[in-house]
Amino acid sequence: MKRELLLEKIEEYKSLMPWFVLEYYQSKLSVPYSFTTLYEYLKEYKRFFNWLIDSGISDADDIASIHIKTLENLTKKDMESFVLYLRERPSLNTYSKKQGVSQTTINRTLSALSSLYKYLTEEVEGPDGEPYFYRNVMKKISTKKKKETLAARAENIKQKLFLGDETMKFLDYVENEYEVKLSNRAKSSFYKNKERDLAIIALLLSSGVRLSEAVNLDLKDINLKMMVIDVTRKGGQRDSVNMASFARPYLENYLSIRNKRYKAEKQDVALFLTEYRGVPNRIDASSIEKMVGKYSQDFKIRVTPHKLRHTLATRLYDATKSQVLVSHQLGHASTQVTDLYTHIVNDEQKNALDNL
C-alpha cells in the first residue's frame, strides 16, 4: 500500500478509536513502530471493539465511546470467547469455504491486543504516575503456534531460496533475459526502472536487510567504498550492515542514473525512488514486493523480499557455519532465530544416511 493511502487509512481508523488507543498510537510512533504495523494493529482493535459491542460486553453506542474500565474488567473467559468467535465466524473471503480466520491471523490479533494491554498496565503514566490499571488479562491468553519442526520448515523454505550460483543467475536473468519475452510497451516500462530494480534486488541479496529497512534507506545511508549501509532496525535502533561486493556494480549503475531518470532534486533524500508525472517519491514496500514477485516468478518460483533475506542468511551460514555472525548480519539479538539456517544447509545428516 502506498504511503499516502496508508496514512489516509490510519487516520480513518484513528477517528473511530477511544482516547486510550489514540494515546497508545502516539506513544508507539515515538518508538518508532512502523506505520504498517500501527495500521494492522488499528484494524485488529476495530475488530475487537466491534465484538465487545456486538456481544453486549460493552454497552457503548460506538467504538470511540468504549470505556477503559471495560478492558480492565474483561475476564479470561471473555477473551476465550473472542478467540472462539474468530475461529468460528464465517470467512469474509467470498472464494473461501473455510469457517473462521487462520491461526496466523488470530495470533496477530492477540499480539496487537497484548501490546495495547501492556501499554495500559505497564508503560503509560497517568496523572499520579501510575498505569491506568494493573490487571492484564492478555497474560492469561496463550497463542497457538503452527506445529512444524525446524527441519520441516527448512525444507519448505529451501525450495524458495536462490542458493549457490542461483543468486547471481537470478540477477543475470533480470539484467539480460527477462526482457526477451516482453512486448515493446512492456519493455519501455522495464527499461525505465531496470537499474533501480536490479540495485534493490542486489542490495537485498547482498545484505539480508528487511524490506522496511531497504525502503527507508536515504542516500546518506549508503557507503559504496566500504560496502556498508546504515539502517533503522525494528525498535528504532540504528545499525551498520555490510553488503557483499557483488552488489556494488548494480548500486553504482543505479546511482549514476538516479537523479536524471527520476527527476530527483537535493530535497529528494530517499535512496530508491519512483517517478510519476515528473514528481519523485520514495518507493513503497508493496511496489518492491510486486517487483520481486514478478521477476522471481519468471525466473524460477515466485518469492517475497523476505525470502531474499533468508537466501543471504543461508548462504552466509553455509560459508561460515557461524550462527553468531548470521544473527549479527540480520540484526537479531540472539542466535535462536538463526537455528533455521543450520537445518537448511544440514547436508551432514543426509550424507551420513547415504553412507549407511
From Swiss-Prot:
Question: What keywords are annotated for this sequence in UniProt?
Answer: Cell cycle, Cell division, Chromosome partition, Cytoplasm, DNA integration, DNA recombination, DNA-binding
Q: Which Pfam families match?
A: Phage_int_SAM_1 (PF02899), Phage_integrase (PF00589)
Gene Ontology MF annotations: DNA binding; tyrosine-based site-specific recombinase activity
For the Tyr recombinase domain, which residue ranges apply? 169-354
Identify the Gene3D superfamilies for this entry. 1.10.150.130, Intergrase catalytic core (1.10.443.10)
Please give the activity regulation comment for this entry: FtsK is required for recombination.
Instruction: Name any Gene Ontology BP term.
Output: DNA recombination
Where it mainly occurs, coarsely classed, is cytoplasm
The residue ranges of the Core-binding (CB) domain are 16-121
> Which InterPro entries does the annotation name?
CB, DNA_brk_join_enz, Integrase-like_cat_sf, Integrase_catalytic, Integrase_recombinase_N, Integrase_SAM-like_N, Recomb_XerS, Tyrosine_recombinase_XerCD
Q: Of which family is this protein a member?
A: Belongs to the 'phage' integrase family. XerS subfamily.
- Give the function comment from the record: Site-specific tyrosine recombinase, which acts by catalyzing the cutting and rejoining of the recombining DNA molecules. Essential to convert dimers of the bacterial chromosome into monomers to permit their segregation at cell division.
Under which name does UniProt file this protein?
Tyrosine recombinase XerS
